């Protein structure tokens, strides 16, 4: 236990007897009710693979602008590169219009349903740079581990609430997710910062859970709680920070908190410090209808049922509309998408193409 952010060992949870599991469940439930986060040990992601993923991702940002630009995000439902602009996969609070001081490279699952319009919205093609073949190879291995861990965490969270282990994962069999490599440049790189400007402004994430592998820094992550205000969560080498997102807050009908967090601007006391975070945003099946849990398991907030895909797309459009208004996004806000190298041709889509009963298959990308 480190303050209000506990360390939870996944293997210890799995091996615990009824009494010890009840004790662990109380700790996890308390942390998610008050803050919305905990540290995860025993997750089984190889440290060597994590290091390679960080190195491969960081290499992308060293490419010249003209090499990165073809991989830029162009639509709300897109993967690829986002430059030094204010962009998010979260609920935005705003920081006076100053752009966030980071770049990001996003990638997603390789699921395919066979319906081009549906896939373009929910399983868009990845944009792998030809100059960095190791990025694709490493990312596929790393995200396979992160998807495994996300499923294990969702099973554990069901256990914390006294639900069947598959309660959450049964709605996540073909979940949408985004793996982001976030590069936070040094102060020497970005120059003087504007008042109130941050690497990432205060926000909550859109999805169910986020798995964060971060680096320790002078100007790093801060989380918020009503009791403590803003504070830096403990850094423990080899652990992942598990953050709850808006969908899980909704699903538990307010019992658990969607973590409010931010990343501070680079500090004048460490002008050469740059950080790279590996952020895995996990949602649920895009066609899933999330019905808030009834009391006493749910929090009794009276939240409505939501559709996962519609909710995520709506928030992405809201985010990019805000950016476009500030001249920080040059792409399209339409939900139609032309084909890519992976999927030639054009794939127009309606607002929410539905594929009831369809199960996407894993395929190469």
From Swiss-Prot:
GO terms for biological process: antibiotic biosynthetic process. Its cofactor is Fe(2+). Binds 1 Fe(2+) ion per subunit. One of its GO terms (molecular function) is dioxygenase activity. Pathway: Antibiotic biosynthesis. It catalyses: validamycin A + 2-oxoglutarate + O2 = validamycin B + succinate + CO2 + H(+); validoxylamine A + 2-oxoglutarate + O2 = validoxylamine B + succinate + CO2 + H(+). Residues 336-348 have a biased composition (Low complexity). Optimum pH is 7.2. Residues 331-365 are annotated as: Disordered. Gene3D superfamilies: B-lactam Antibiotic, Isopenicillin N Synthase, Chain (2.60.120.330). Its EC number is 1.14.11.52. Disruption phenotype: Cells lacking this gene are still able to produce the aminoglycoside antibiotic validamycin A, but not validamycin B. It is an enzyme of class 1 (oxidoreductase). This is Validamycin A dioxygenase. It comes from Streptomyces hygroscopicus subsp. limoneus. The gene is vldW.
């Amino acid at each position: 236990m480190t303050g209000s952010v506990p360390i939870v060992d996944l293997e210890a949870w799995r091996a615990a007897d009824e009494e010890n599991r009840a004790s662990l469940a109380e700790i996890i439930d308390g942390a998610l009710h008050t803050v919305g986060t905990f540290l995860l040990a025993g997750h089984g992601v190889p440290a060597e693979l994590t290091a390679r993923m960080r190195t491969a991702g960081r290499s992308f940002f060293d490419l010249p602008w003209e090499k990165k630009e073809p991989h830029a995000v162009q639509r709300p439902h897109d993967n690829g590169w986002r430059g030094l602009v204010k962009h998010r996969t979260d609920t935005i609070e705003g920081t006076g219009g100053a752009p966030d001081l980071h770049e990001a490279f996003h990638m997603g699952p390789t699921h395919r349903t066979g319906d081009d319009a549906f896939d373009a919205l929910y399983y868009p093609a990845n944009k792998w740079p030809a100059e960095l073949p190791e990025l694709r190879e490493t990312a596929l291995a790393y995200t396979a581990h992160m998807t495994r861990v996300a499923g294990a965490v969702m099973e554990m969270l069901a256990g914390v609430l006294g639900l069947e282990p598959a309660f959450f994962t049964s709605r996540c069999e073909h979940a949408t997710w985004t793996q982001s490599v976030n590069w936070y440049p040094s102060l020497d790189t970005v120059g003087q910062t504007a008042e109130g400007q941050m690497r990432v402004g205060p926000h909550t994430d859109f999805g169910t859970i986020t798995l964060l592998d971060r680096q320790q820094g002078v100007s790093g992550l801060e989380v918020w709680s009503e009791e403590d205000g803003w504070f830096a969560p403990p850094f423990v080498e080899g652990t992942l920070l598990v953050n709850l997102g808006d969908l899980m807050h909704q699903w538990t009908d307010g019992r658990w908190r969607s973590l409010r967090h931010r990343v501070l601007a680079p500090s004048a006391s460490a002008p050469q410090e740059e950080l790279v975070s590996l952020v895995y945003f996990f949602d649920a099946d895009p066609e899933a209808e999330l019905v808030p849990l009834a009391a006493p398991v749910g929090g009794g907030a009276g939240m409505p049922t939501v559709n996962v895909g519609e909710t995520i797309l709506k928030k992405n459009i809201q985010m990019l509309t805000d950016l476009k208004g500030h001249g920080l996004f040059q792409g399209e806000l339409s939900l139609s998408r032309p084909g890519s190298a992976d999927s030639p041709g054009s794939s127009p889509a309606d607002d929410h193409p539905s594929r009831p009963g369809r199960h996407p298959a894993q395929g190469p990308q």
